[in-house]
Amino acid sequence: MADTNSSSSESSEKAPVKISNLDVSQATSSQPYHLTVKRGFLAMFIMYASQTLVGLGFSYWLRFIHGAGDGAGTIDSQMIGMTSVLFGGAITLLWVWTDIRRYGPSFLPQIGLQQSVIKTNQSVMLVFLLFSATHFLAWTYRSVILPLVGQEGIIGGASQMFAHIRETGSVLGMAGFLVLALIVGPVMEEVIFRGYLQSAFARRLPNWGAILITSLLFMAGHGPMLLWPMYFIYSVAWGWLFMHTKSLKMAIAIHILSNLFYTVVAVMGWGILA
């Protein structure tokens, strides 16, 4: 009897433990995803590709509707530009949402979707201080330095778009512009440039290196080129704010505030557009 128990226990000890492929895949999927530079560039590619495809599709649709290809009408390039960024931005944010769904809650802080690590009142104070400083520098560059070299009245692409829509009197166009300037645009750009790119670079580089590289990419995505120094200043300030607070919400807040400021300036007709 004792021999039987002994042999059964030995056989149970020697029995191999089978690990199914399902167990391995579950163990692998339970590991949190770590944001990479490759993912950051993919996010930027999705953003620009979405805008390009929407712009092309809308352009061909307008040509088909109005017969502009036969000379019977004209294509409004400013409206195409606004539509492409607006709907392309919505597609980009949808892609970001699928990323969050795919990688789970651990992915949120990696792209800065969390509360600020400093107190709310300090965060708000930083937003307004940086807003004031950057816009003073931007005004100095555009209204003082550029005229010294014979470049007066240079305005940015968004301001050109607003001026055109205002001239046409399109209510739908103005509504679309406001949604783009105050919601979709700031959220999309901050999620992609600060949330994905800067966060990814910061894993491989010192924080300031990540800010500078991201700011160069941000600057290159705006026009005209004469205003690149302004966009670089904005991006460095917003990148520093993101680095300091660890919260994308603060970067989005100052971006919205900046766009709101220029929208008010445009509505009032003040000559400090950028």
Where are these regions (language model features)?
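Membrane-interface interhelical connector segments
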Residues: 145-171
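Glutamate identity and glutamate-enriched acidic tracts
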Residues: 10-13, 99, 152, 167, ...
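Transmembrane helix-loop-helix hairpins at the membrane interface
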Residues: 132-139, 162-274
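Membrane interface segments of multi-pass transport proteins and intramembrane proteases
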Residues: 69-71, 112, 145-154, 200-208
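N-terminal, membrane-interfacial amphipathic/helix-forming hydrophobic leader that caps
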Residues: 1-126, 132, 143-144, 257-274
